[in-house]
A protein has these predicted regions:
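NAD(P)+-binding Rossmann beta1-loop-alpha1 motif at the extreme N-terminus of oxidoreductases
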Residues: 1-62
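A conserved regulatory-domain signal marking ACT and ACT-like small-molecule sensing domains
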Residues: 288-314
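Rossmann-like NAD(P)-binding element
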Residues: 58-88, 92-93, 99
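Internal alpha-helical scaffold of NAD(P)-dependent oxidoreductase catalytic cores
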Residues: 140-227
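Interdomain hinge/lid region at the active-site interface
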Residues: 209-278
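Residues at the starts of beta-strands that form the adenosine-phosphate
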Residues: 5, 30, 118, 145, ...
């Protein structure tokens, strides 16, 4: 690949990990970074993720051959508007890393249509409840889906260039329509986060009268609610940019709960057994057992005896 300049706006977990992956495959590329947080900028520089950093988004944009917007969705749309007013390189590729796609693609087609640029929406489906450049890792995207949602501004050759640029991620590239992306992720990503936060809120309220709730919360409860630690601002933005699909998932779930409640009330042993068995069989058939990368960070618990030098044996 010829020497290029890549500008990553947003040096959080996703943006910083993208920088590491690009650096791994293409050490010759100049990587510029934007972030409002001085701490994230310093971490990115110290770890060699980027060559130069700025807290002024417009400063590096005209220098870039590729611009990746790795910021919250509303900020991504605002930056797209800003890019429309800047003197960018001809044929520059603009992409993003947002968790919803329809509004972002629509914004690009609206504001960038008269610019000599190429735009392709993208969603790297990997992450963690941990945040910031300090949590970034070069293996974050390994075997995870990296979804491209092309637009009317995605000219021939754009996807191939992006796949080559991002080859160091070792991700699984796939192309999907933006609207279909938002429908599918409402089920397997957005709704589960609502459920995890709801479970935590319910448990917290319940523990006010039943103190043992917190003591007994382990195992399955911990696994189901881990993602409730995710950054609230990001998830607020996701829900507000994919409302219809998410509301439909919530209605579906209400219906499911009503059916389970009716079976319990009727003491319908067969219906209850079939409910759990359907869930069990569906889980076995899904690919979640076969893929890595989607949740690349885990909490590791080790029992250490309370004695001198015990930790040295780990």
């Amino acid at each position: 690949m010829e020497r290029k300049t890549v500008y990553i706006a947003g040096l959080g977990l996703i943006g910083a990990s993208l920088a590491l992956g690009i650096r791994r495959a293409h050490p010759e590329i100049e990587i510029l970074g934007y972030n409002r947080s001085e701490e994230s900028r310093q971490v990115a520089l110290e770890r060699g993720m980027v060559d130069r950093v700025t807290d002024d988004f417009a400063a590096f944009a005209p220098l870039a051959d590729v611009i990746i917007l790795a910021v919250p969705i509303k900020q991504t749309i605002a930056f797209i508007k800003d890019l429309a007013e800047l003197d960018l390189k001809e044929n520059v590729i603009i992409s993003d890393a947002g968790s919803t796609k329809a509004e972002i693609v629509a914004a690009a087609e609206k504001y960038l249509q008269n610019k000599p640029v190429r735009f392709v929406g993208a969603h790297p489906m990997a992450g963690s409840h941990k945040t910031g450049a300090k949590a970034a890792h070069v293996t974050l995207f390994e075997n995870a889906y990296y979804i491209f949602t092309p637009s009317s501004l995605t000219k021939p050759g754009t996807l191939e260039e992006m796949k080559d640029l991002l080859s160091g991620l070792h991700a699984r590239f796939i192309q999907v329509d933006a609207a279909e992306h938002d429908r599918v992720t409402s089920q397997i990503s957005h709704f589960p986060h609502i459920l995890a936060s709801s479970l935590m809120e319910q448990a917290a309220a319940y523990s006010q009268e039943h103190e043992l709730t917190q003591s007994f919360a382990a195992g399955g409860f911990r696994d189901m609610t881990r993602i409730a630690e995710s950054e609230p601002g990001m998830w607020t933005s996701i829900l507000l940019t994919n409302p219809q699909a998410i509301l439909e998932r919530l209605e579906d779930f209400k219906d499911q709960l009503d059916k389970v409640a009716a079976a319990i009330e009727a003491k319908d042993e067969t219906a209850i057994w079939e409910f759990f068995n359907r869930g069990r069989q569906s889980r076995k058939q899904m690919e979640i057992h076969k893929r890595a990368g989607v949740d690349s960070f885990y909490d590791l618990f080790i029992e250490v005896p309370d004695e001198e030098d015990a930790i040295l044996g780990i």
